[in-house]
Amino acid sequence: MSFIVYPALDIRDGRVVRLRQGDYAQETSYGDDALPRAQALAAQGAQWMHLVDLDAARAGGYTLAPLLASIRAQTPLQVQTGGGVRGRDDVARILDAGAGRVVVGSLAVRRPDEVVGWLEEFGAERITIALDARQDAQGQWQLPVHGWTENAGVTLDVLAQRYARAGMRHLLCTDIARDGMLAGPNISLYQHLSALLPGVAVQASGGIRDVADVAEARRAGCGGAILGKALLEQRMDLAEALAC
């Protein structure tokens, strides 16, 4: 399985931002230069990027189609993108706008019967299932919903295996406790998922601080890694990460 590095840009109100543990009240802004940043990522050798619509994630209705179209027209980047997917037509629209893959998150937890059908309709290579997880006191990985305020009632392992049986090829898993914290990725979680889901490209997300973390995610069996805050704050060289 190939390993893909996904430099990430999260967009809110037209600005590149990062949230701390998904909290909209804990935002750091990095400017309104998303397209030049994407062009710079391509110039450094990136083949894919991860683009998140934070406004749509909150209110629905994907708003980044113009930016996505510009990135596709002005760079060779493939784009994995999501935020605000509320139904099948949203997936179709985002793919039509030029996405290489559409990320389906909260809906993948709330309406799995529907999302399983999209893997067949659009093709498993065009859908990334995103599951945000938090470990409970018993060591089980729960899937918080509604702004990470309550658990979905199904564990990460159970739902991930269900999607794997349905043909899922790409799983983005974020350890909520590490999101935006630059504390290192949860390697034991990704080792577990990679062993549990043979043939699925597991994307490590949350806490990656440097090239060593990227290399460790690859050794853990991951098929990719999302690079956010560490790149934006120039704590990591993208070219070195791509060479892992």
Curated annotation (Swiss-Prot):
> Which InterPro entries does the record associate with it?
Aldolase_TIM (IPR013785), His_biosynth (IPR006062), HisA_bact_arch (IPR006063), Isoase_HisA-like (IPR044524), Isoase_HisA-like_bact (IPR023016), RibuloseP-bd_barrel (IPR011060)
Pathway it works in: Amino-acid biosynthesis; L-histidine biosynthesis; L-histidine from 5-phospho-alpha-D-ribose 1-diphosphate: step 4/9
Main location per the UniProt record: cytoplasm
UniProt GO BP: L-histidine biosynthetic process; L-tryptophan biosynthetic process
CDD domains linked: HisA
Q: Which GO terms describe its cellular component?
A: cytoplasm
Which cysteine residues pair off into disulfide bonds? none
Q: Does the keyword Isomerase apply?
A: yes
According to its UniProt record, the EC number is 5.3.1.16
NCBIfam families noted in UniProt: 1-(5-phosphoribosyl)-5-[(5-phosphoribosylamino)methylideneamino]imidazole-4-carboxamide isomerase
**Annotated protein name in UniProt:** 1-(5-phosphoribosyl)-5-[(5-phosphoribosylamino)methylideneamino] imidazole-4-carboxamide isomerase
Q: Which organism is it from?
A: Stenotrophomonas maltophilia (strain K279a)
